[in-house]
Swiss-Prot record:
<feature type="domain" description="PCI">
    <location>
        <begin position="306"/>
        <end position="514"/>
    </location>
</feature>
<dbReference type="GO" id="GO:0005852">
    <property type="term" value="C:eukaryotic translation initiation factor 3 complex"/>
</dbReference>
<comment type="subunit">
    <text>Component of the eukaryotic translation initiation factor 3 (eIF-3) complex. The eIF-3 complex interacts with pix.</text>
</comment>
<keyword id="KW-0396">Initiation factor</keyword>
<dbReference type="GO" id="GO:0016282">
    <property type="term" value="C:eukaryotic 43S preinitiation complex"/>
</dbReference>
<dbReference type="GO" id="GO:0003743">
    <property type="term" value="F:translation initiation factor activity"/>
</dbReference>
<dbReference type="Pfam" id="PF10255">
    <property type="entry name" value="Paf67"/>
</dbReference>
<dbReference type="GO" id="GO:0001732">
    <property type="term" value="P:formation of cytoplasmic translation initiation complex"/>
</dbReference>
<protein>
    <recommendedName>
        <fullName>Eukaryotic translation initiation factor 3 subunit L</fullName>
    </recommendedName>
</protein>
<dbReference type="InterPro" id="IPR000717">
    <property type="entry name" value="PCI_dom"/>
</dbReference>
<dbReference type="GO" id="GO:0033290">
    <property type="term" value="C:eukaryotic 48S preinitiation complex"/>
</dbReference>
<comment type="function">
    <text>Component of the eukaryotic translation initiation factor 3 (eIF-3) complex, which is involved in protein synthesis of a specialized repertoire of mRNAs and, together with other initiation factors, stimulates binding of mRNA and methionyl-tRNAi to the 40S ribosome. The eIF-3 complex specifically targets and initiates translation of a subset of mRNAs involved in cell proliferation.</text>
</comment>
<dbReference type="InterPro" id="IPR019382">
    <property type="entry name" value="eIF3l"/>
</dbReference>
<comment type="similarity">
    <text>Belongs to the eIF-3 subunit L family.</text>
</comment>
<keyword id="KW-0648">Protein biosynthesis</keyword>
<dbReference type="InterPro" id="IPR011990">
    <property type="entry name" value="TPR-like_helical_dom_sf"/>
</dbReference>
<keyword id="KW-0963">Cytoplasm</keyword>
Amino acid sequence: MYGGDEYANNSEYYDDYAHTGDPQLDMEYERNYYAARMPDNVKYFLINFCQAIKEGNLYDIQNMYENTFPQISDHHFDKTAWPEEQEVAAIVDNDKVFLILYKELYYRHIHARISGGPKLEQRINSFFNYCDFFNLIISAQNPVMLELPDIWLWELVDEFVYQFQNFAQYRARLTDKSQDEIQQLCVNHSNEWSILCILNVLHSLVDISNIKKQLEAISQGVDPQTVAGDFGKLSFYKMLGYFSLVGLLRVHSLLGDYYQAIKVLEPIEIHKKSAYSHIPACQISTSYYVGFAYMMMRRYADAIRTFSDILLYIQRTKQLYSTRSYQNDQINKQAEQMYHLLAICLVLHPQCIDESIQQVLREKNYHDAMFKMQCGDLEVFKSFFVFACPRFVSPCPPAADAPMEDYVKDPMEHQLLVFMDEVRQQKDLPTTRSYLKLYTTLPLTKLASFIDPNASEDDVSKLLIRLLCFKHKMRNLVWSKGPSGLEGTFKSGSELDFYIDDDMIHIADTKVSHRYGDFFVRKILKFNDLNRKLKNINI
């Protein structure tokens, strides 16, 4: 509806003004004053944006949200904030709903573009603006008749969780704050952006939308409208509820509670396409956090499947989001992180993956790093994990009397410690596997001498522990079916199995040979079907 060219070439606008003392005259004066000093394209955009939201015109709202707002931001507010609330209120007749939505974009812009990040006051004001928005839609007796595009609803929930994460990191960084600032944070702002508030909001959105019941109904082939309730019948509430489930996944992952992270998604069949997965950024974010949670739970097969599926999806649908540069950058970064995590999982749990994913791993030289990891290079494991992991946060901020240190990295270092402990337990397994693959029977003493030519009786006893570790680590819980990503059956991830009889290891190759016949039969049948359809087309 409104292109970027209409909103270019206007100058800066800031000046002082005086009040008359008469409330009505002052209000009229402010309206005229702010309208006069605001660039015409910004003023017209805000007026039209407000009108589109009032009328519920989704096409215009989405166009202005996805295209015009970023274009104006680039032209006028690249390194500065958008106009203050009172300036905008004067030209939109103090429209309460619009001002809340405008401030959501206003503070999001400050977080993304202002050098040095938002000030404490802006962080707190952003929190209270989110409270105003969620109170408006959750506390209402009847559903609020508000229409917003799904992409905005997703980015609103995603930004809400991001600002919580950002504030937690800001709060944990004591080295750049005075004692008075720390005291103020502990006394005056202890409840703002607290983990309890975040969880309460997200669970409230899930509950009011009945999204879990709707997803269960869909999986059972029942009309979801029968269980949606008055609020959940509306797309606005339904999508907010769905995106809140993904928000909860992210929050629990940031806290290091991986079981609960997967648990909150139970109504969603993670490994199946859904009618709700039409927002690429949401689908990619979901797979990233699910895959990471699986990896930390030592469910490597599920992690590999999750990462492989979404990386294939990114390869095939890149054109859908390439028009939005900031979203493209975010998705590319997350894809790079997932390639790093996939490389880790393939080292710890070798298995076949799609050839196109293998090709990317080869082209980007991941194989060199993977070889080093297979040889037990712990530093490569560590660097890959630090690059690819989420930016963890602590649910509890530092105390007011805590030493003046930077506590931001503490949660990440704890998760790294847990991960590296698991890696150390497995770093010798590739060597053990390589020897076992060469034999069908192998004496324990001979294997011990392969590993260490100077092996003693004690080393043979240690070898039994290593073989038991191999057995244990290669058996993983693997999801097969059902809505719960936590369910599954134990399967061996190794291509070989063995048992020990007295001092002899008996080894069996369990690798299943590929059957290509079924693949070609399916393709031939599909080709024949396509030929029949082409012949029936009348030109």
